[in-house]
Amino acid sequence: MNTRSLALALLAGVGAVWTPHTALAGNPLGIDHKLNYDDSGIWKRSYQKQLAVGLALTTIGGALFADNDSRLGRTFDQSLDSMVLTAATTSVMKVAFSRERPSENADPGDFFDGRGHQSFPSGEVAEVTAVVTPFIAEYGDDHPAVWALALLPAYDAVARVKVNGHWQSDVIVGAAIGAAWGVWAHRRHSPLIMGLLPGHGMMIGYARRF
């Protein structure tokens, strides 16, 4: 799998969800505009939270319990690295840029407004992208259906904008960060986080050899 192509494909998937619209001046990518608030159906905020928490718990559980020497176990380890490094990156950027959310201010060009404003970039879209990228990179060629995982960050990106939690550029940059760390983690020969634990991980369970 060409990891550069993977990253571009993920970004294209997130970017493609936006239809042409008159954007307001003063925003980074020239695409930001506030959508009518929609917290109904599949866009409900509670579903977005469940997706983020579910993926995080699945990733942590997979890294802890899967055989670290197996293909699946290594991929979970890579997703864990990607998720944690992505979270660290977006957390720093949120504080540094202190951008107001659409729910707080209708002006997408309002950055550096101080503590408490954390719109840029989207941490949730970044997390979802970071988790799925290593799996797509690892299994995408053998099992093309795995590419369907790219729908998760695309869905989350649309949902975050619909509930006025983020601007369009927030979710696109978030996806870029998650994809970048996901590609980086997949290229590593050994996991970063699980590699620091005794015995190269904490696989729980048992294995039988005949």
Q: Which stretches of residues belong to each language-model region?
A:
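Interfacial segments of alpha-helical transmembrane regions
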Residues: 62-88
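Hydrophobic alpha-helical transmembrane segments
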Residues: 48-65
